[in-house]
């Protein structure tokens, strides 16, 4: 089923070239279907890449999806034009009275900072608190998962001795939970992070159920409040060349990133 986006969203043309059914508001109003309303708080630096990755994933549902992109007003994006943000994104103050079926809060390249040092932390905590009353289910990705585990449950992150980078094998813990229905018993997923929330700390938190984990990468997937909060420590949205791009970016910046771990060949 289609994903509804603004007619002139740049990644719309790419999605259509991949035979992904996307439509704009003009066409959507003629369909007598109640769409799923999804909000995406995109904190990633390359916002158009993340838009494309997440819209690809959302297009796999059998339901019509109405997507709204949210930005933080307290941060000035360095890699995305102001015109793009003003055209295709909304600010929290303009949507705080709305209700959504689902929300995705992405990762962000700020994990080596203390949470309170991030310039938009206060705004983010207000948004996370707002999801408790205005969003049916919220998915937190990578740093977003770390931020939410810290904000809601006081679970602290810690630095890793080396960047956790590449594809890693994971195992499903509880097949009775609908969220992991259809998962293979073991599956590969990408990670790209300098920090982690220790899995033993998460295990000790009675509010969070661990659904998938890795012997090498630690915690991967969990939920709280019967699925109203979903935590993903990796990057399931990444496409096949994203890790390669990050590897070359890091090395060009004189930061020596480890070669991506390729669990598929181990």
Predicted feature residues:
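Short loop/turn segments at strand-loop or loop-helix junctions that form parts
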Residues: 72-73, 100-110, 233
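A short beta-strand-loop structural module common to alpha/beta enzyme folds
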Residues: 64-76
């Amino acid at each position: 089923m289609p994903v509804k986006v603004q007619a002139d969203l740049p990644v719309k043309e790419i999605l259509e070239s991949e035979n992904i059914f996307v439509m704009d508001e003009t066409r959507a109003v003629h369909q007598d279907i109640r769409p799923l309303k999804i909000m995406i708080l995109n904190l990633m630096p390359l916002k158009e890449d993340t838009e494309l990755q997440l819209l690809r994933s959302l297009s796999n549902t059998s339901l019509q999806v109405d997507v709204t992109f949210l930005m933080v007003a307290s941060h000035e994006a360095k890699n995305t034009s102001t015109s793009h943000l003003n055209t295709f994104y909304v600010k929290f103050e303009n949507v705080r009275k709305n209700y959504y079926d689902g929300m995705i809060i992405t990762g962000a390249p700020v994990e080596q900072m203390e949470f309170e040092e991030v310039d938009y932390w206060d705004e983010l905590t207000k948004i996370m608190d707002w999801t408790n009353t205005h969003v049916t289910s919220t998915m937190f990705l990578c740093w977003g998962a770390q931020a939410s585990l810290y904000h809601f449950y006081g679970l602290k992150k810690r630095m890793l001795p080396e960047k956790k980078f590449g594809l890693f094998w994971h195992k499903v813990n509880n097949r009775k939970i609908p969220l992991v229905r259809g998962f293979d018993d073991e599956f590969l997923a990408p990670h790209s992070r300098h920090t982690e929330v220790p899995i033993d700390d998460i295990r000790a938190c009675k509010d969070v159920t661990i659904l998938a984990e890795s012997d090498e990468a630690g915690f991967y997937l969990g939920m709280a409040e019967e699925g109203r909060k979903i935590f993903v420590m990796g990057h399931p949205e990444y496409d096949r060349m994203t890790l390669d791009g990050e590897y070359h970016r890091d090395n060009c910046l004189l930061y020596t990133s480890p070669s991506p771990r390729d669990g598929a060949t181990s």
